[in-house]
Amino acid sequence: MARYIFITGGVVSSLGKGLASAALGALLQARGYKVRLRKLDPYLNLDPGTMSPYQHGEVFVTDDGAETDLDLGHYERFTGRPATRQDNITTGRIYQDILTKERRGDYLGATIQVVPHVTNAIKDFIVDSNDGYDFVLVEIGGTVGDIEGLPFFEAIRQIKNDLPRGDVIYIHLTLLPYIPSAGELKTKPTQHSVKELRSIGIQPDILLCRTDRPIPKEERRKLGLFCNVRESAVIEARDADSIYAVPEAYHAAGLDDEVLAAFAIAAEQPPALERWHQINERIRNPEGAVTIAIVGKYTGMKDAYKSLIEALSHGGIANKVQVKLDWIESEVFENEDPAPFLEHVNGILVPGGFGQRGAEGKIKAAQFARERDVPYFGICFGMQMAVIEAARNLAGIEQANSTEFGPTAEPLVGLMTEWLRGNELERRSNAGDLGGTMRLGAYPAALKRGSRVSKIYGDVLEISERHRHRYEVNTAYKDRLEQHGLRFSGMSPDGVLPEIVEYEDHPWFIGVQFHPELKSRPFEPHPLFSSFIEAALVRSRLV
């Protein structure tokens, strides 16, 4: 039967509960245990699919097509276990399910209340389908004291009494701020946070304290005394030079030992952390460096590209080089020559996105990469802009554009329903729902034999990758584009939807309709990112 570890946060948000959960999961996994990680999000949205990247950051898509919190990306990268839609739930989804049941009459006329109906739904989600796992780690989003989080805290309080004694522990992630004028770390915010947690019936077993310096013995003693935890359970979570150094750092601080002790489990063997050590050695001692320009529209919010950043670092790990990122707002190129911004870089990546803002700048970035032989990686929207660039500047289709931006005489890119219905432009109503209208999750793609991408994937002819898009490249223009050198080297197995384009006579120019960054791991870098960084490394030696 699974044991449960609940991770809560206090004092301030954005302390890294997701990363802490992922690192602890990796440590338990390294000891031979089977782990599952889940995330409870207290916001009222059904999912983050329609939320602004500036507010929520990246939307992480699972194989089964769920749009989830970016923390699930950390879970996958650290444990290697693919997440599913059953690993993330929001208040909005819970209320939707409850109200659907109420309208259906499932509650037999009962008054629907937060306790017990909402809390029971949360508990049912937490314990569902956990057979075969030794530990289930459950992260509660937000901080203690947030009004929207109260039903979740009440549910995890109740669940300790529902399960056998000793099967549940609570870890509280908190902040120890350093006050320069006083010259000391302050424990009072943590004390108040734990007091708030205890007021709703939850006593933390372990305090995980974020800090930028060692915790003095006196402060550790004070935290243990006033927060009612063992002194050994006050764990120092120092800032690390890389997120992949966190598992080793947490082990050195005693987190996994303290977790096992809280469950009364004897720690017979230390965790096998050799591969983590090897990864960190490569990160700390690179044999070179490459600079990649990311030409996007959310560059002011790096969390919008979290998986992309990590996938590029994985490509660097595979090639033993440091990957430096040059963030460029694509709108800049609409009024300025891209050359001064891009001449010094070793590779250009145009990531996914939605909407017209900055689109012309991305097209100019693709043109610069094509004409100057700079490695180019276009992902989703980045592939579509590369196709439009080829249509305009190689095939002579001057009005080539996307129907996403409005009516166009030459719809190189449009809604999938448009092309599947014989190019009769059929558009979703502007008043319609945005949620649930995309191609989401893992889909297969057939690769052309002998193509560059086929070789990158290891000479395979079929792959499976995760998608998140409404628009597709129009296959009616496929032959004209191929006549001018843009090869459609990957298609859906039925030949209807373009998946990959490339230039054979370019050092490295690939556009993909899917999101390969979502499947990259530090120990298994995605082959496209490894190859892209390798091409950038070759470019760096030529410039």
Swiss-Prot record:
Positions bound to CTP: 13, 146-148, 186-191, 222
Keyword Coiled coil: no
UniProt keyword terms in alphabetical order: ATP-binding, Glutamine amidotransferase, Ligase, Magnesium, Metal-binding, Nucleotide-binding, Pyrimidine biosynthesis
Binding positions for L-glutamine per the UniProt entry: 54, 353, 381-384, 404, 470
Active site per UniProt: 380, 515, 517
Cited NCBIfam families: PRK05380.1, PyrG
This protein's name: CTP synthase
Organism: Rhodopseudomonas palustris (strain HaA2)
